Amino acid sequence: AGPVTPWPRTVPVRLEPRDDGGGARDDIMITTLGEVRTSLADGSFDPEADRVTTSDGRVLDHYYRDSLGITYYKPLDKSIFPVPPSGWCTWYYYYRVVNPAEVIANAHWIAENLAPFGARYVQLDDGWQGMGERGAGAWRDWSTIDTRFQEIGLGGLADSIRSLGLEAGIWIAPHGQSNTQVARSSKVFLWAPGDSSASTTWEGRYLMDPTAPAAPAYLGGIFKQLRDLDFTYFKIDGQTIVVHEYGDKTKYMHGPVPQGEPREVGAELYRKTLRTIRGAIGDSSYLLASWGTPLEGVGLYNGSRTGGDIVQGWDGVLGAVSTVQRWNFLHNIAWYSDPDVLIVRPPMREGTARVWSTIMGLTGQALMSSDRLIDLPDSRVELLRRVYPATDIRPLDLYRPTNTRKPIMDLKVSHLGRDYDVVGVFNYDPDNSSNRLLSWSALGLDSTALYHVYDFWNGTYYGSWEHGIFIDVPPGDVRVITLVRATERPELISTSRHITQGWVDLRALSHGGSATKPSLSGESRVIGGDPYTLTVGLPRGKSSFRIATARASGSAGGAPVRVSWTSHQGYATVTIRTDSTQVVRWGIDFEPAAPYVYPVTSPQRIEATATGLSNFMLHWPVEYYPRSAYQVEVDGRPVGEAFGARASVAGLAPGKEHRISVRSMWADGSAAEKAAELTWTPTVPDSVYISELEPLSVQQDWEQLGVNRAVRGSALSVGGKEYAKGIGTLSESQVSYRIFGSFARLEASVGLDDGVRRRSPAQAIFEVRGDGKTLWRSDTLSRGSAAVPVSVDVSGVDELTLVVTPVVQPNTDRDDSDPADWLDARLIASPTGSGL
C-alpha cells in the first residue's frame, strides 16, 4: 500500500470551502497523501489534543467533539492496521444464496489476479447462518449454520482462504437472535411482560440485554468461537438499531443502567458490548460496524460503514460519492470510513465503473469489491488493479460539507521530493457531456506557473500550461488529471501501477546528469506480468530533450527485466516488463532535442450560448490547421487552456459587459498573433424557472436531482396533481443557486411527491434560505396533502438555498429517501431589472 506517514501527528486542515474559480464555493474536495503543504490550509489539527490552530492564531479546542459533534472522538489507532482493508465481500453478487464453493473460487481468483495488487481479505456476508435464504425467522440464529456450509464448516472455509495467503472475514448481526430456544435458555435477552420479546427489529426477533450478568459470556463466546476458527475481519451489522433500542428499552433490562437522555444511555450500553467483542477477537482483528453511520462506536471500531447499502448502476455511484464526501472528515482520523463496496461488472457502463473506481482510489477509503470476479472482462479487472490497494490518504477538509457531490476531487501527494496533484473531474450527469474549468488557483497552485497535464486513465499527455485547463468529460464518466509543476529539467509525471502514480510502487527517485544532459533514476516495485510505464514531462520551450538511453535491472534471483522507451513532443515514456514481482532499479539518460513548432492561427470567430444566469458555453469552429490548445481570456485575464472547440465559463455577473477572447497555442508556448474576440453581456430575464438554472451545489445522499421530474424519474405529482416544471429532491436535501441579487421574489408550490413508497407516515418541512438566513419555512407537510404555495421576497439575495428536512416520528427510524418537490418554482426579476 506504499509508505505510511507517522500517526498521530499534526496535519494541515481546511475549515471551509473556497471559490473554485468559476463561482462555485463548494465544488472541490481536497485530500492528502504524505506530508503535504498547501496554501489552501486554514491552519493545523493536532489529533491527540483534538485541537485546531488557525493560521491567524485562533485555537479551537475539542474540535471533533464539540465543533463536529463526535462525542467519543479519539485518534485512530493505526499501529496494527496502518491502512484500510482491501479485499472482496460476497454480499452484492450472492446475497443470501452464497455457498462455499463460490467463495473459494473467488478466493483463488483473488490470490492469482488481485492479491499481487494488494487485495488481502475475503469476507463472507449474510447467508451462512441459521437457514440462509430460507425463512426469515432463522436469519439471526448464530447457533447453527446453513446446510450449504455444514460439510466444509466455517473453520474449513477460513482455512481454505488462509491457505491462499489471504485473510478470512465474516458478517454477523450479533446483538440479535431469532432462535427462541436460544433466547430463552441464555437468559441474556430483553423480555416484555407476558413473556414476549421486548425488541423485534431487523437485528433479530430478540435483542440482547447489555446489562444481563451473562451477556458478556454469551456475546464474547460467539466472537471467540469465530476468532478460534481463524476469522480476523468482523463486520457487525445493524448497529444504529442497537443503539436506538438500548436507549429506548431500558425499562426491560435486568441490571442497572446509566443516567441520562435515551440516546446517551443507549450509546454507553452499546459501547459496553463493543468492549466485550473487542476482548474476544483481540486487537489484531479488524472490527467494522455497519448500518448507517454509528458514531457511538468511534474509538472502538477500526472502521465503519458510513451509509446505506449501495445498488448496482448509476444510482449506486451517486450513493457512493455522497457517502464518501459526506463522512470523509472522519476517515483516517477517527476511523477508516467504509462507503460500501465497489462494483464494476457489466452490464454497468465502462464509464460508470471508472467513476466508481476513481472515487475509491482517490480517497483511500476501505476498498472491498463485490462482483463474481471470475466473470469480469479484462477491462474491468484493469480498473481494479489500478486502485488496489487502499492507501494512507487523509482529508484536508475537516468540516461537514454542504455539497456531497463535488465534481472535483483533488488528491495532493508529497513523496520522494515529488509534489503533485491527482485530480478527478467527474460528470454526474449520465446523459450529457460536461465541460469544466480546472483552475490552478482553486487547487492552491501557482496560477502563473507551468504544470504538466496528464490524463491517467487514457494515458494522454496534454502539454504544460499556466492558469488552468478546460476538461471535457463524457456522460457519467470521469477524467483523472495529474498535475506536476514543470521545470527546466525532465520531471516524472506518472507511473502506471496505481492511481496515486508513484506512492504504491516508487521506492527511490533522483535527478542527475548535467543541465544539457540530465538524467533520472529510481527504484520501483514492479508486479510480474504487469507492464510498468514511467511517463516523464520534458521542459517546454524552443529547446528540450529526448531519451538517449534507458536501462533497468531486477533483484537478485528475479526474472529478467526488459525495458523499452519512446520520446514524443513534450514527454517521453519508459516501459519495464518482468515475469516476477520484484524491485527494479532503472535509469534514464536524456540528450538535447529541438521540438517541432507550427505557426498556429486562431479561430475566425467565437460564439456564446447562455447556460444559466452567469454561465455560458463558448464554442468556435474546429481549426483545419494544427494547434495544441486554445487559450481563453475573460476581461483581459487568462483563464485556462481548452483542448477542444468549446469552453464553459461561469461566475460572470449578469448585466455587465464582458470581453472574451480565444487564441490558438502551440506546445512550446508560442501563440497566434491575433485572437478571436467576443463581447458578452449576461442578461437577467423577467422570470426564470429554477429548473432552467444550474445549481451551485446539490446535497442529498441518494438519487440525482430531478429536473422537471420527480427524483426517481416519474412526473412531478403532489396531492394527485401533476406539474410540468420544477425540481424533484429527497426529503433530506439542500439545493443552492447563485442569483446575484437580481430577483425580487421566488414563487413556487411545495409538497411530498405522490411517489412516496413507504406505508409509514412521510412528513417533511420545506425551507427557503437566502445567504444562509431563513426567509420562509413551512409547517410539517405530509404525504398525500395538496401542494402548499410559496411566495418569498429574495431581493438582494446572492445565494438561494432550497432545503427539505424529514420529520421523524417517535419510535421510527429517520428516512431521508422520500421524494419531495419544488413545483413551478420560478424567480421573478427585481422591478429595476437587476439587483446589482
Please state what every model-predicted region is.
Residues 463-503, 568-594:
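C-terminal beta-strand-rich structural cap/linker in extracellular carbohydrate-active enzymes
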Residues 649-668:
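Beta-strand-rich modules
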Residues 471-473, 576-578, 649-654, 739, ...:
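Short, flexible loop/turn segments at beta-strand junctions in immunoglobulin-like
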Residues 1-121, 146, 233:
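Carbohydrate-recognition beta-sandwich/jelly-roll modules
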Residues 18-23, 33, 38-55, 86-89, ...:
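Active-site-proximal substrate-binding groove within the catalytic cores of carbohydrate-active enzymes
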Residues 1-4, 8-16, 20-27, 121-348, ...:
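Aromatic- and carboxylate-enriched substrate-binding clefts and catalytic-loop regions
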Residues 595-625, 654, 672-683:
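Pro/Thr/Ser/Gly-rich low-complexity, intrinsically disordered linker/stalk tracts
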Residues 601, 606, 642, 676, ...:
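Gly-Asp-aromatic-enriched flexible segments
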